[in-house]
UniProtKB/Swiss-Prot annotation:
Pathway: Amino-acid biosynthesis; L-histidine biosynthesis; L-histidine from 5-phospho-alpha-D-ribose 1-diphosphate: step 1/9
Keyword Nucleotide-binding assigned: no
CC annotations in GO: cytoplasm
Name of the protein in question: ATP phosphoribosyltransferase regulatory subunit
GO molecular function: catalytic activity, acting on a protein; histidine-tRNA ligase activity; transferase activity
């Protein structure tokens, strides 16, 4: 039997040193953004019962879930998303809360992916949920929060594409078509495959009204600015479809009034495999990442599976993809703290320790040297990115070496503190 003790499973990744610091910094920024936007953070368990995710509107197929068993033989899963656990928490622990609830989270989720497809099996997901209100104000709040979050992280040249789940549903609800064919139709539209769509519709055209046929045929082309809404309205008299178009238009106009319309585009060909979303849906894209970095929308039917009927909307950000985009855009902002290494003669250990503690209180990264040899100390400091080496070698002034300028000085403690605070 092969020994895998030196490897990690497909789709997993070790995150080391600077990359780890950057990721934690992004997560910290996200938490602050949500906090100052009025959202309260919640934490759910990594392991849930499979039944939590086993519903006919679940957005994650069961074959994408990591499964295991507890000691009673019950099926468990590593959570494949965060929205469903929040639905469970809301339905079971927040029935008496004041609504609307504004919740946020940052956590790892787990999804089984095919080998060699380049996708991660463990993803850090961060997002918000607005629960208990079904007006467009909450949809606008969710989308605007998404835009401001990406801007606050320093991301450039991104777009939020708006669609409406009810639009496609309205066009196909009276259509006599097998489930597998409907799924195929959705996939063709999502991929904007005009040739395949025309061929597919020609084969079943007798099941459509002429209007619906023309509109569905044009769905892959109906993306762009707000003018797309009027173009789509001219192609249908379907009342439900028209209402969906009005909802997108009204949401767009609210975002325009705020002054963030430059980040919005419309995509009426945004359809979903499973009827998870019930209203406006949106995805965030940036050139540097091939897949969406953010997705969200209205999901009014989820929480009822946990004992209470509540409308909800929200979004989730893929933190790992955000890191990739920020790195490629060279806009990764991170405050660089000064780093200090203190070496000492044994009789000055207490003084060295006390000074290290003083520097830490001033938010300076500081450590005592575990090495005694001068050359080893210098080599370690350079590889570790240390800015200053400080030596406690006598009672008076301290040895200070600036590794950037390579200058050496002998200074008093207060002079060193002033130097480090520059």
């Amino acid at each position: 039997m092969e020994n895998w003790n030196k490897y990690i499973p497909e789709g997993m990744k070790d995150i080391l040193f600077e990359e780890s610091n950057i990721k934690l910094n992004i997560e910290d920024q996200l938490r602050k953004i949500y906090k100052y936007s009025g959202f309260s953070e919640i934490i759910s368990p990594t392991i849930e019962f499979y039944d939590v995710f086993n519903s006919n509107i679940q957005a994650i197929p069961q074959e994408k879930m990591y499964k295991l068993f507890d000691n009673l033989g019950r099926i468990l899963v590593l959570r494949p998303d965060m929205t469903t656990p929040i639905g469970r928490i809301t339905g079971t622990k927040m029935k008496d809360c004041t609504y609307p609830l504004k919740l946020c989270y940052t956590a790892n989720i787990f999804r089984v992916n095919e080998k060699l497809n380049g996708k991660r099996g463990e993803i850090t997901q961060s997002g918000i949920e607005i629960i208990g209100t079904n007006g467009i104000k909450s949809d606008v709040d969710s989308i605007v929060t998404a835009i401001n979050t990406l801007l606050s992280l320093g991301l450039k040249n991104f777009k939020i594409e708006l669609g409406e789940a009810g639009f496609f549903q309205a066009l196909t609800e009276n259509m006599e078509i097998k489930e597998e064919n409907l799924k195929k139709l959705k996939e063709i539209i999502r991929n904007k495959n005009y040739v395949a769509l025309k061929k597919f519709l020609d084969e079943i055209s007798s099941k459509y009204s002429k209007e619906d046929f023309e509109l569905i045929k044009n769905l892959p082309k109906l993306f762009g600015d707000i003018k797309i809404i009027e173009k789509a309205k001219a192609l249908t008299k379907n009342k439900k479809a028209l209402k969906s178009l009005d909802d997108i238009y009204n949401i767009y106009k609210s975002i325009e009034n705020i002054g963030l319309e430059a980040y919005i585009s419309i995509d009426l060909g945004m359809v979903q495999n499973i009827d998870y979303y019930t209203g406006v849906i949106f995805k965030g894209y940036v050139e540097e990442v091939g897949d969406s970095i953010l997705s969200g929308g209205r999901y009014d039917n989820l929480i009822q599976h946990f004992g209470i009927e509540l409308p909800a909307t929200g979004f989730a950000i893929n933190v790992d993809d955000i890191m990739i985009a920020l790195k490629k855009q060279n806009t990764m902002s991170m405050d660089k703290d000064k780093k200090v290494l203190i070496f000492y003669k044994e009789e000055f250990l207490r003084k060295a320790y006390d000074f290290m503690q003083e520097l830490k209180m001033k938010k300076i990264i500081c450590e005592l040297s575990l090495l005694d040899d001068d050359k080893e100390i210098l080599l370690y400091s350079k590889k570790k990115g240390i800015d200053f080496i400080i030596g406690f070698m006598g009672e008076e002034k301290l040895f200070v070496k600036d590794l950037k300028s390579d200058k050496i000085a002998f200074l008093k403690k207060d002079e060193i503190e002033n130097l480090l605070m520059l």
